[in-house]
Amino acid sequence: MPDRIARRLTLAIAATLAVGVSRAGEPYGIGRPATPQEIAGWDIDVSPSGAGLPPGRGDVRQGEAIFADKCAACHGAHGEGKPMDRLVGGVGTLRDKKPDKTVGSFWPCATTLFDFVRRAMPLNAPQSLTPDEVYAVSAYVLFLNGIVPRDTTFDADNLAKIKMPNRNGFVSAQPPPGGGAKP
C-alpha cells in the first residue's frame, strides 16, 4: 500500500509541475512589448568610465545660475546643505564617527554625480534637466568642492577624466577611470 500511495503522490506532483511549466511562458494578455525607442528613453545609466554620457556641454558659470534656480532651495546657495544634504566640504572626515559624505569627500567618480543629478534631481522634478544643464550643474558642484577651476566646461569627452579625491576609497568590480582600490 505505501508504494501505491508514493507512486500516486509522485504522479500528482509531476503532473502539477508539468502544468505549471507549460503555462509559465504564456503572457497575461495585457500591455505590449516596449519599442526600442521607449527603452532608449530609460536607458540613461552612466558608468564610471563615462560610457552612457549623452552629447552636450556645460560650464561652471552656467551651472551656478542653474544651481541657484533649481538646487539652492534644498542644498543651500553654495552647496552647504539645509534642509537637504551638504554637497561640499567634509574632506578628511571619512574616518570620523560622523563623516561628512559629500560629493567632494566621498564620491569616487565625477560621472556618478552626473548620473545622480540626471536621474533624480531636482527632487520635485526628476529627469527634467537637459544634458547641458546636468553638465553645467556637475561643473559647478565640483568647482564648489575645489576639484575643478572656475573656467571648467564639461562634456562627454572630459567628465570621466576628473580625478575625485576619494577615487581610491572604494573596492569595486568596475573601478573608476585612472585607478581605484584593488580587491
What do these predicted ranges mean?
Residues 2-10:
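Bacterial N-terminal signal peptides that target proteins for export
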Residues 10-18:
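Bacterial N-terminal signal peptides
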Residues 20-24:
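Sec/Tat signal peptide C-region and signal peptidase I cleavage site
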Residues 29-66, 122-126:
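Electrostatic cytochrome c docking/interface patches
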Residues 43, 55-84, 88:
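Sequence/structural segment immediately N-terminal to covalent heme-attachment motifs in c-type
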Residues 61-69, 80-81, 106-110, 128-131, ...:
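Sequence context surrounding c-type heme c attachment/ligation sites in exported
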Residues 64, 79-122:
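Gly/Gly-Pro-rich "capping" loops immediately C-terminal to redox-active cysteine motifs
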Residues 124-183:
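Flexible coil segments in periplasmic/lumen-exposed cytochrome c-class electron-transfer proteins
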